[in-house]
């Protein structure tokens, strides 16, 4: 009788020990834990996607400096390019603001040819030479600093002239000092002070070549280009009618 009781007690204890455990006590790596991990990963991935979509719809505001440099649409120029520059012309100027026409006006910053990393302050040109009382030019001319986008090079080809450049984290414009006739069309009276009974005369704008920074494909390079530099009088002797 006692043996039967012991057998029943042992069978009861074995049955309790073999009963399945709850999900709260499932060891790592079990199917229940894997389902929970997959669910957590899916929720995390969905949260990351939502965050990325929100960032794309509402991008972070850019700094004012970045917006200013981006809107300039300029080309970054290697400082070594200026060290290779030769035949510097006083009619070409790299400046952060429009330069003055007279030395008496406010000076501006520009890149110097000898040391482009050192910006000097000076004015380049005068608007017109000073004449003594009673002196007049045979042709009226006008001078101004201009920005060119295209020009003709020394080989007669049309080239693209760089207007804005990014040099040492500052935006500079390339200015050209041009002089041309005030009246683009010749006047019947001819040049001032020329005897119209003996000479045919007219005023015309002449050009010369200066070294300018241009675009060659996707690279910046120095080229000789033509710009207006003077207004001169052209004369020819009238033929006598017999």
UniProtKB/Swiss-Prot annotation:
Tissues where this protein is expressed: Expressed by the venom gland.
SMART domains: NGF
Disulfide-linked positions: 139-203, 181-231, 191-233
Region of interest (Disordered), residue spans: 47-70
InterPro entries in alphabetical order: Cystine-knot_cytokine (IPR029034), Nerve_growth_factor-like (IPR020408), Nerve_growth_factor-rel (IPR002072), Nerve_growth_factor_bsu (IPR020425), Nerve_growth_factor_CS (IPR019846), Venom_nerve_growth_factor (IPR020433)
An annotated GO cellular component: axon
Keywords attached to this entry: Cleavage on pair of basic residues, Disulfide bond, Glycoprotein, Growth factor, Lipid-binding, Metalloenzyme inhibitor, Metalloprotease inhibitor, Protease inhibitor, Secreted, Signal, Toxin
Subunit organization: Homodimer; non-covalently linked.
Name of the protein in its database record: Venom nerve growth factor
UniProt similarity note: Belongs to the NGF-beta family.
Signal peptide: 1-18
Extra facts: The presence of this protein in the venom could not be confirmed.
Coiled coil residues, start to end: none
Positions of glycan attachment: 166
Any one Gene Ontology molecular-function term assigned to this protein's record: peptidase inhibitor activity
Superkingdom of the source species: Eukaryota
Organism annotation: Drysdalia coronoides (White-lipped snake)
